[in-house]
Curated annotation (Swiss-Prot):
Region (Interaction with STAM) location: 453-571
Zinc finger (FYVE-type): 160-220
Keyword Acetylation among UniProt keywords: yes
Entry protein name: Hepatocyte growth factor-regulated tyrosine kinase substrate
Its job: Involved in intracellular signal transduction mediated by cytokines and growth factors. When associated with STAM, it suppresses DNA signaling upon stimulation by IL-2 and GM-CSF. Could be a direct effector of PI3-kinase in vesicular pathway via early endosomes and may regulate trafficking to early and late endosomes by recruiting clathrin. May concentrate ubiquitinated receptors within clathrin-coated regions. Involved in down-regulation of receptor tyrosine kinase via multivesicular body (MVBs) when complexed with STAM (ESCRT-0 complex).
Lineage of producing organism: Eukaryota, Metazoa, Chordata, Craniata, Vertebrata
Tissue: Ubiquitously expressed.
PTM annotation (Phosphotyrosine): residues: Y216, Y308, Y329, Y334
Residues annotated for Zn(2+) 2 binding in this entry: C182, C185, C212, C215
Family matches, as InterPro entries: ENTH_VHS (IPR008942), HGS/VPS27 (IPR017073), HRS_helical (IPR024641), UIM_dom (IPR003903), VHS_dom (IPR002014), Znf_FYVE (IPR000306), Znf_FYVE-rel (IPR017455), Znf_FYVE_PHD (IPR011011)
Regions of compositional bias (Polar residues) in chain numbering: 379-398, 725-743, 767-776
Amino acid sequence: MGRGSGTFERLLDKATSQLLLETDWESILQICDLIRQGDTQAKYAVNSIKKKVNDKNPHVALYALEVMESVVKNCGQTVHDEVANKQTMEELKELLKRQVEVNVRNKILYLIQAWAHAFRNEPKYKVVQDTYQIMKVEGHVFPEFKESDAMFAAERAPDWVDAEECHRCRVQFGVVTRKHHCRACGQIFCGKCSSKYSTIPKFGIEKEVRVCEPCYEQLNKKAEGKAASTTELPPEYLTSPLSQQSQLPPKRDETALQEEEELQLALALSQSEAEEKERMRQKSTYTAHPKSEPAPLASSAPPAGSLYSSPVNSSAPLAEDIDPELARYLNRNYWEKKQEEARKSPTPSAPVPLTEPAAQPGEGHTAPNSMVEAPLPETDSQPITSCSGPFSEQYQNGESEESHEQFLKALQNAVSTFVNRMKSNHMRGRSITNDSAVLSLFQSINSTHPQLLELLNRLDERRLYYEGLQDKLAQIRDARGALSALREEHREKLRRAAEEAERQRQIQLAQKLEIMRQKKQEYLEVQRQLAIQRLQEQEKERQMRLEQQKQTVQMRAQMPAFPLPYAQLQAMPTAGGVLYQPSGPTSFPGTFSPAGSVEGSPMHGVYMSQPAPATGPYPSMPGTTADPSMVSAYMYPAGAPGAQAAPQAQAGPTTNPAYSSYQPTPTPGYQNVASQAPQSLPAISQPPQTSNIGYMGSQPMSMGYQPYNMQNLMTTLPGQDASLPAQQPYITGQQPMYQQMAPSTGPPQQQPPVAQPPPTQGPPAQGNETQLISFD
């Protein structure tokens, strides 16, 4: 597939469209040019055309066959190789068999016959000739053949020649020196010898391609020769005897001159009436629009006819009788008048450049000065008028355009008449030198030639002017596009800046939040430290209170008014060397602390306020405290055991069966107590059956030695002095405490005299006494 495949497909679709009413030769020629100049490969082009030939629509197939015919005739050997082969011939035969459209069948037969005649001398294309003969034998009727239809004289670009050195300067090719081929001659050249670019019309190459210097000079010389010959007379006229004759027009008689004058007068009158009507119309328009008042001054410029004035126009009235349509442009008086106006205001025949109006005010001419000094209105039509010169002012109304159209129409009629007269003379064999009509037509056409050139120049100038405007519009469009791009870029920058600012703000907020979190953590840590410090201080205060309580307890224990048996027992060991640990909490003298009581409770401090008895009936002997082997105990009055037992039973808790069943008798004496103890108190060796009232009853100590009995107790206790009163027996639990807590507010009980037991009392009395005694 070539580089121009897209263009080729578009042109092929256009040339084979089913909507066409006739063959589109322009598209077909462009297809041929694409194949000839190498933009589209021949194989690809022929295959695409074959697809169109096999289309179901007969119109598309017929136009595709037209394209194939033109391609074969104009594109040379590369296309011949693709068409004149067995495959293509078989496809055409199959298409002919299944095609029912008469025009398509006739076109296929016509192409096969023409190709067979054209390639009859080419051995490699013999398959076309064989196909033609076979189809004739099969009975196909071929259309009438013309030899001119088989003229394949198309020139194609030569094949490229490969060599190792330049064809002109003989420089060897290498890494630095590259190979280049000339598209005109096909030879190989170096870069210096093939640096020119040119078009090659004979090969159908309409774009500039690389050619060598000799081919470039040859092609340009031909182009210059053709350009120079266009300005000269045609060769038919130069070779004819007419060019040898005098070019002076023949004299006319008086009648022709009079008719010419009358015709010119009528034309002048009609022209003046038209100008007057136009002037009135413009005046009414200017009064309605006062801003455009300077415009009537510009109307004084020479009209369209004066712009085409030329010294050659003196011969124009001679052709008046030949073509009446040229009378308006060949009016002698009219043109003389316009020439005088042109001499008064020297307007050049060429278009006024865009820079000249700036220098015109200094010349003192009224018409150009009025155009330059006139203020520019707000509309866009006036700047074009002031810049384009008088020619553009003629297009402000429709008169000039109409006159130009009439001029062109008249000139076309004259040329067609001239050509027909020449052809008629040629067909009849008459000489054009003897035909006065041909001579007069030639003179009239020659006289209008300068006007035609002037009109072409003006049109070309306007075309350049509008192309310049289009370029400016394109520049403005590009500038607007660039401005839009800059604005978009600016908006993008602003958006990015806003996003960056937002991102920075988010980062700052995140940093602030992190700082606040750290401060919060520090604050919580400080609060926790403060709480821990307060707890430590409270713990220290509690420890200090405990220390103070311990000191207070120790001080109370050391005070003589509050003897504590537990402290004494801890300080003074027994005679046997055994130190007994107290099993219950420290009890203050004169207090009652049941189990589960708390310091400061009413039960704890109710007895603290009760004063203990100041003096006992039996003061302690001084000798007893000095003896270390003697156990110091509370000295209970021996004569009043019954009086103290009753308050103890009432004050103590009633849950203890021992206290509830114990009813002391008023008769004092150890014997009675000993005799009643086994009935009311449990044995010492047995565990108490009461609830947790005292520490001794709730926590019985498991001693590692043998329990006390009467024999061990008698051996353990020191000798008792006969002068001391008998100690009150200890009852299990907190009975000594209850005995100490006896109310002292009541009337003093009369203690009966204690009967001393006889010294020869038996052991049973001692056993009963032993059960009533307990050591703290």
